[in-house]
């Protein structure tokens, strides 16, 4: 565990991670797992970033709400996040939807996923609640956001990104005054309001909220009693507080964690196949925008004990090699050539195969003479010998999930349907 000094505010906070969503825009990649459980970066899962931020910030009480196809997520959390100790006033609770308030009601929204577990949260008596989305890639020290929340006297503090106005139409957007107090909260506006003094940019919600716990519990109980509510933070809880209380925006630039190699605040919603592929492939750059090698802010995860990667054969046309690539443990590159690709644990790439701009999830087997470019290959897929992907857009679209930008998602069920 990191030796980072635990700050007083973080010690009195509980992080609550919302990890129940499917992430339907990832298509078949989330057929068997929730979006927060999707693999990322060669070793981790998406949820590990929010959890690592909480841990590295000094927060030692964490709850994770799960719902959609949660088995792989729960298994990952049990294996990788079981080091919290009650005798040190630490806790880590996995909170699957379990009809705690009604025999017919699962989690009906993001706010409801917290409300249904009030009886678990309140005995811990945290002074502050940090509500987090479990499906974004970023590094952030929540201690700074907690400090702003206390200093401002806000009822809620909302983490925000500064984005170009015309790129903010897909977000919940904060209309703020000169003190970053939120005047209005607008969900996916056609004409987003600009930031005072910087009108070309807007403040977009990151789905991160800080509350005093007592205030949040009262707000959740009031919302649960409203039959017209959709039980959602963004649609119900936050707009109510903006209208009747005090809401303040916290700018991500003020708390993002950057190493010496990271020049701009890094935050990604990897909710589409294109965005997921791009964020992984970006890690193969000489100096990537996201530094996952920063030892001062480690990304904690469950890591199997595996042998190291191995590259074999050195013939002219059969050389095990990798250029500008990330290759994880237990991979064997047997006479295959990789270029600008990212391989997770346990991949086997056999002789004469070629991979370029490929994101390959764990335990994939690449047959001889396969030629694959601009692909995401799902866990455990067996690529047949001689398969070519990335050269014929029309054929690729018939066989696989091909995006408009030309990225192909390949799953085992798609391979099984091929007429080879």
Swiss-Prot record:
Pfam families: Hexapep_GlmU (PF24894), NTP_transferase (PF00483). Pathway: Glycan biosynthesis; glycogen biosynthesis. CDD domains: ADP_Glucose_PP, LbH_G1P_AT_C. The keyword rRNA processing does not apply. Transmembrane segments: none annotated. Keywords: ATP-binding, Carbohydrate metabolism, Glycogen biosynthesis, Glycogen metabolism, Nucleotide-binding, Nucleotidyltransferase, Transferase. GO terms for molecular function: ATP binding; glucose-1-phosphate adenylyltransferase activity. Belongs to the bacterial/plant glucose-1-phosphate adenylyltransferase family. Involved in the biosynthesis of ADP-glucose, a building block required for the elongation reactions to produce glycogen. Catalyzes the reaction between ATP and alpha-D-glucose 1-phosphate (G1P) to produce pyrophosphate and ADP-Glc. NCBIfam families: glgC, PRK00725.1, PRK00844.1. This is Glucose-1-phosphate adenylyltransferase. It comes from Agrobacterium fabrum (strain C58 / ATCC 33970). The lineage of its organism: Bacteria, Pseudomonadati, Pseudomonadota, Alphaproteobacteria, Hyphomicrobiales.
């Amino acid at each position: 565990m990191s030796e980072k000094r635990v700050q007083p505010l973080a010690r009195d906070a509980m992080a609550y991670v919302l990890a129940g969503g499917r992430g339907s825009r990832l298509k078949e990649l989330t057929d068997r797992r929730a979006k927060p459980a999707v693999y990322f970066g060669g070793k981790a899962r998406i949820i590990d970033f929010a959890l690592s931020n909480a841990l590295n910030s000094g927060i030692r009480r964490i709850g994770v709400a799960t719902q959609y196809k949660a088995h792989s997520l729960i298994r990952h959390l049990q294996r990788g996040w079981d080091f919290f100790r009650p005798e040190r006033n630490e806790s880590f609770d996995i909170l699957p939807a379990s009809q705690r308030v009604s025999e017919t009601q699962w989690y009906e929204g993001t706010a409801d996923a917290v409300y249904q577990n009030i009886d678990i949260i309140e005995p811990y008596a945290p002074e502050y609640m940090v509500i987090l989305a479990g499906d974004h890639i970023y590094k952030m020290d929540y201690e700074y956001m907690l400090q702003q929340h206390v200093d401002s006297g806000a009822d809620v503090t909302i983490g925000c990104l500064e984005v170009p106005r015309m790129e903010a139409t897909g977000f919940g957007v904060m209309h703020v005054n000169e003190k970053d107090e939120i005047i209005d909260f607008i969900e996916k506006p056609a004409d987003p309001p600009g930031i005072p003094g910087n009108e070309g940019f807007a403040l977009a919600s990151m789905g991160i909220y800080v509350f005093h716990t007592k205030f949040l519990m009262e707000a959740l109980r009031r919302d649960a009693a409203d039959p017209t509510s959709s039980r959602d933070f963004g649609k119900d809880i936050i707009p109510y507080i903006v209208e009747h209380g005090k809401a303040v925006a916290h700018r991500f630039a003020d708390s993002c964690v950057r190493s010496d190699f990271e020049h701009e605040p890094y935050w990604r919603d990897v909710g589409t196949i294109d965005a997921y592929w791009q964020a992984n492939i970006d890690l193969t750059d000489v100096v990537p925008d996201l530094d996952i090698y920063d030892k001062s802010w480690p990304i904690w995860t469950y890591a199997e004990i595996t042998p190291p990667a191995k590259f074999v054969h050195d013939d002219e046309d059969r050389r095990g090699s990798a250029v500008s690539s990330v290759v994880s443990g237990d991979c064997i590159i047997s006479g295959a050539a990789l270029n600008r690709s990212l391989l997770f644990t346990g991949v086997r790439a056999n002789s004469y195969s070629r991979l370029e701009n490929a994101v390959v999830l764990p335990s994939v087997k690449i047959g001889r003479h396969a030629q694959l470019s601009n692909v995401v290959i799902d866990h455990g897929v067996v690529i047949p010998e001689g398969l070519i992907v990335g050269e014929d857009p029309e054929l690729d679209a018939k066989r696989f999930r091909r995006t408009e930008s030309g990225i192909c998602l390949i799953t085992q069920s798609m391979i099984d349907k091929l007429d080879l």
